[in-house]
Amino acid sequence: MYRDRKISTGITSVLLCLITMPASAQEAPTQSEAEFQKLMPVTGTVDTYFGDFKLDHSFPASGEADKIYDLMDHQRASQLYLWGLPLVGMTRWHQGYVDAYEDYDYNVLLDVKRFNERRGILTANETTRYFWGFGNTRDGALIIKIPEGLSVGMIVDMWEQSPTDVGIFGPNAGKGDDLVIVGPNTPSDQIPEPADGQDVYKLDTDQAYYLLRMLGTDEEVEKLIRQVQIYNYGKKMPTKILDAQDKYVANYQPRGLAYWKMLHLAINNETVQERDRLFMYWLKTLGIEKGKPFEPTERQTKILIEGAKVGELMAKTLVFNERLEGVLRQNNWRMILGGKRGDGIKFTQRTKYYDIFDPRARYTYEAIATSPAMTVPKPGTAQAYIGKFEDEKGGRLQGGNNYVIRIE
């Protein structure tokens, strides 16, 4: 008995060695003391892309610390501009309606069909009649019921991620949708009991955007849209459809200090995502905090204004000089939505090891809203969006000119 146990232990030891050998095969990177010293002198000048900085016995020399802090904060401001683009765009959209329409509120459907009503909306179609609005899940689950028929739509959170399409491209293929939208703070007793035919979706934000396009004649559209129900659980009431009155409301991000004021409003209206806590610290160093008034110092104000300017230049570059290979196509065409995961925008911003940053900034600067069907197109059951900013010779396309697209 003792011998058997001893043999078993020996076999176990061998197995452990075999298992651990691959992990220890890779050597840790090393650096000599001389290499270490050469890269950052104790006393001397450090030459960088952003200029020269002097060290005195390892300390930043007199006056250098202020320059370094300015550099640090300017870099943070420009990256925070890119980070906040989706949230600022969605917040401005909702807030614009709050300011423009006396009767506008959550759970309202805005009837958008005229030129000025869609002029301020990024990438809105010129001829499509839209019905859209915002809901809030903080006090109760958002209930959305869509009748059977020809409709296309989506649900989107405030970071422009989408849990689902609705209508003919949704999971029920136009047979009718009974949606329960739950947010991070929805009370458990304000969520309905599960029911057959009901689809429950969990959002990362309290607020939700919904869009519907009813297809058919004017009479068919009116009949369908009047059957749509939008309300918070336990507070069912008739859904109000509000005429957009040909009013211009912008949903694109404002410029200058107005951008940061809108971002301050946005973060105070929403739940902080775990992935964004470090960015929230950056905002704090620039005078923007959740739960506190927007009161940046004179220095912070200058940095924020400059950061918005540089950040927008970065966003324009991401849009018009695309370097993400996963969305590029032949003859200067590229995918506006979709493309290779990690490079293209999808209905989710999460990949296995990271959340996308540049693709999200690129898309949410030039357009608005995503959905599974728009970003993972399938023949016959989805949509595809491609774009082109240059002609075949590399010349920039101009809005005042006419062009012919030849399909062969």
Task: Go through each PLM region and give its residues.
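Bacterial N-terminal signal peptides that target proteins for export
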Residues: Y2-I11
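Sec/Tat signal peptide C-region and signal peptidase I cleavage site
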Residues: M21-A25
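Bacterial N-terminal signal peptides
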Residues: G10-T20
